[in-house]
């Protein structure tokens, strides 16, 4: 009996040590990526190149096989025909994805699981920043998306230790140019390191650093019929409550793969007031929560890598682009709840001091109309903002506790 007690205590201690080590690892990784010296990982900066070099070094230490034409790097140049190339003055910029893989085994080795995250951010602000007063200040993007990049590295460490007689090849890729219109994932889809038609599923991690007691959101749960049951079994075992949400479209890199008829999952810990602001710093990251998400994503990835049956793709038409290559439009300062909200856009909060805050909007409100535009989803909301200019006063219609209300907001100007 004494020996059993000692064994149990030893196992518990090892578990605690392992968990602590993981927290230390992700803290080190994320703090490097979100350091001021990375220059906000803006496209074309030396800071972004430095971040890519760090990721490649970690891939090498983990033991991944280099998968790009330049070792771990997949370089590309932003084409002038890219949707936002001219608007953002980025045509001709040289950048690179970082790609490594774990070779598969047995009869499943020819199929591929892609696990990805974008590692770029806004640099020193610009037209997509939501704090116009901070243009020229480093936007470190700790949550967006140093957190997802860090999670990809941690998942790679975990999966590199797993083995099976039959397993799909697992490709890990961190994408550049996501903020400018999914440039890195689009380039990868056109130049995959393994044939795209052999890709079984894609897992994307974007903004996974602010769990802090909230439910994880997993988008794309309806892109394969088998996903809901698979996710329920793993998240229940791993004690990770989650909210499943819809198709595979949305403003992150999984959209590129879903548009190519690949089932996708997108892990997301939620919006917050620091989104696309210079205040998105490492001190606000929930590191134990980030480790927990990486653990769950690892288990999901391994189940997908080793299951024998096919996935049944569920396709829906691609919605119109919410960007159209012209930016987001005037500034309101709402923080949308990215989970589905039929009949409008539910807010998780508003930015203090913003036009939305001054108009009395608050978290939990559901926006249903902006000016003359009916709002059913985020695409409608973006279109409505693009239809107005900074300084215009618009009527905002919203639901609060089921009651239809309206207010007037004077729209502001975005950074740039």
Predicted feature residues:
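Sec-dependent N-terminal signal peptides
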Residues: 4-12
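A non-catalytic alpha/beta surface segment that caps or lines the substrate-entry region
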Residues: 41-103
């Amino acid at each position: 009996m004494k020996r059993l007690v000692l064994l149990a205590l030893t196992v518990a201690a090892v578990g605690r040590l392992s968990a602590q080590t993981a927290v230390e690892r992700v803290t080190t990784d994320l703090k490097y990526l979100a350091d001021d010296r990375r220059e906000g990982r803006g496209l074309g900066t030396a800071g972004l190149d430095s971040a890519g070099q760090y990721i490649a070094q970690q891939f090498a230490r983990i033991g991944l096989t280099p998968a790009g034409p330049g070792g771990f790097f997949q370089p590309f140049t932003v084409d002038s025909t890219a949707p936002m190339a001219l608007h953002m003055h980025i045509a001709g910029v040289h950048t690179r994805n970082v790609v490594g893989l774990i070779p598969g085994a047995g009869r499943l080795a020819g199929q591929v699981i892609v696990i990805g995250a974008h590692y770029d951010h806004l640099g020193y602000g610009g037209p997509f920043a939501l704090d116009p007063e901070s243009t020229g200040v480093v936007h470190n993007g700790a949550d967006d998306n140093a957190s997802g990049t860090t999670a990809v590295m941690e998942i790679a460490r975990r999966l590199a230790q797993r083995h099976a007689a039959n397993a799909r090849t697992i490709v890990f890729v961190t994408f550049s140019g996501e903020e400018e219109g999914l440039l890195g994932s689009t380039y990868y889809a056109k130049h995959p390191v393994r044939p795209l038609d052999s890709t079984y599923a894609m897992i994307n991690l974007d903004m996974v650093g602010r769990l802090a007691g909230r439910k994880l959101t997993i988008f794309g749960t309806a892109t394969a019929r088998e996903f809901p049951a698979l996710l329920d079994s793993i998240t229940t075992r791993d004690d990770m409550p989650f909210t499943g949400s819809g198709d595979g479209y949305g403003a992150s890199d999984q959209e590129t793969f879903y548009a190519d008829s690949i089932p996708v999952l997108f892990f997301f810990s939620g919006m917050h007031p620091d989104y696309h602001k210079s205040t998105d710093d490492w001190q606000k990251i929930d590191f134990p929560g980030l480790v927990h998400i990486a653990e769950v994503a690892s288990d999901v990835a391994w189940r997908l890598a080793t299951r024998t049956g096919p996935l049944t793709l569920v396709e829906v038409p691609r919605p119109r682009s919410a960007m159209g290559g012209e930016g987001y439009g005037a500034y309101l300062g709402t923080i949308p709840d990215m989970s589905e909200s039929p009949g409008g856009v539910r807010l998780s909060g508003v930015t203090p001091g913003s036009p939305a805050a001054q108009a009395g909007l608050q978290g939990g409100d559901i926006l249903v109309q902006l000016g003359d535009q009916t709002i059913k989803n985020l695409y409608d909301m973006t279109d409505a903002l693009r239809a107005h200019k900074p300084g215009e006063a618009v009527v905002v219609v919203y639901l609060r506790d089921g009651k239809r209300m309206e207010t007037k907001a004077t729209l502001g100007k975005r950074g740039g």
